[in-house]
């Protein structure tokens, strides 16, 4: 999606089902409900190609035992965001904290990485906000130390109270990071809020104010975080 980012299943981008053509699944990603029938994910998750010119022929969501169709409502190439709608009605929605992130605060990534290998259950990783900007001082993204892998794309990044502070997007290639550990990024919740406002989607302003223990945080996030499958 951007020069210097993995375009395979290693970090951040959809997981590609290269060896399972009978399923006709081109890739998978993660999304989360921002209203009862609207879902946010990355724009590249709902496209068949790296250039994001060809949309998935069909998009399916899976949340627990429920599986449902998804349809693109709006997309923003520059910020790599997409809004999807479904006839399925989900009662739990994400709480989005628009107030800016702080360097050093805890961050949790929830998503469905490498679902063909690791299974379709949601996975969580923990880290810190490493920087308040992305590559080349990109102010719409921020750097995190929490691991994200192929299939995490589009998933929520949470603070220690369970509020969404960003959207998982990608990792930097190792040759750009000096050969050390992979550097990961998220789209800021402020950028997400602007995208939702443009599409007249209201935010749940009743934010969580108490620090949650991690099992509770994960349990709540799993109720609005879904696996997204892109079909050719």
Segments and roles (model prediction):
Residues 45-50, 92-140, 148-152, 168-180:
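Flexible, gly/ser-rich surface segments that form the specificity/activation loops bordering the active-site cleft
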Residues 21-23, 44, 84-90, 96-98, ...:
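A structural micro-motif recognizing beta-strand termini
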Residues 32, 147-168:
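Catalytic nucleophile loop of clan PA
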Residues 28, 34-79, 88-89, 102:
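Catalytic-histidine neighborhood of serine endopeptidases
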Residues 1-19, 58, 69-74, 91-92, ...:
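C-terminal cap/linker of serine protease catalytic domains
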Residues 18-42, 67-69, 154, 179, ...:
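A conserved glycine-rich beta-strand in the N-terminal activation segment of trypsin-fold
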Residues 25, 33-34, 75-77, 88, ...:
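Extracellular/periplasmic catalytic domains that process cell-envelope and extracellular macromolecules
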